[in-house]
């Protein structure tokens, strides 16, 4: 089980990313634009640098919904490999069966 503070920090980051996604993407578009002037590009870069670090999507890390475990995360199920194995063996995940051939 992950620390509650680590899970809370990750949730806070997700909210910040979601709230600032539109503004950040517009600034990035201007900074990479071929038609914008150099001054506009520089202003966009400065504005991006002034934004909080936690608003950047790269700082997000996927965590298990049940335990908060940051490693061994399965995207399709949004849980860790350990929780997946336990739930699959107990038949709690629909459509998942143990392989046999």
Curated annotation (Swiss-Prot):
Pfam families (UniProt xref): Ribosomal_S14
GO cellular component, one term: small ribosomal subunit
GO molecular function annotation: rRNA binding; structural constituent of ribosome
Entry-linked SUPFAM superfamilies: Glucocorticoid receptor-like (DNA-binding domain)
GO biological process: translation
Listed transmembrane segments: none
Top-level taxon of origin: Bacteria
Coiled-coil parts of chain: none
Keyword annotations: Ribonucleoprotein, Ribosomal protein, RNA-binding, rRNA-binding
Family label: Belongs to the universal ribosomal protein uS14 family.
Record's function text: Binds 16S rRNA, required for the assembly of 30S particles and may also be responsible for determining the conformation of the 16S rRNA at the A site.
Record text on subunit structure and interactions: Part of the 30S ribosomal subunit. Contacts proteins S3 and S10.
Name of protein: Small ribosomal subunit protein uS14
Organism: Chlamydia felis (strain Fe/C-56)
Protein's gene: rpsN
């Amino acid at each position: 089980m992950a620390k509650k503070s680590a899970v809370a920090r990750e949730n806070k980051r997700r909210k910040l990313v979601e709230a600032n996604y539109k503004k950040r993407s517009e600034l990035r578009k201007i900074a990479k634009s071929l038609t914008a002037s150099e001054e506009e590009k520089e202003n966009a870069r400065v504005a991006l640098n002034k934004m909080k670090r936690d608003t950047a999507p790269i700082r997000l890390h996927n965590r298990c919904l049940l335990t908060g475990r940051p490693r061994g995360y399965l995207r399709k199920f949004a849980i860790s490999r350990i929780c997946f194995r336990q739930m699959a063996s107990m038949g709690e995940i629909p459509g998942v069966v143990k392989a046999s051939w």
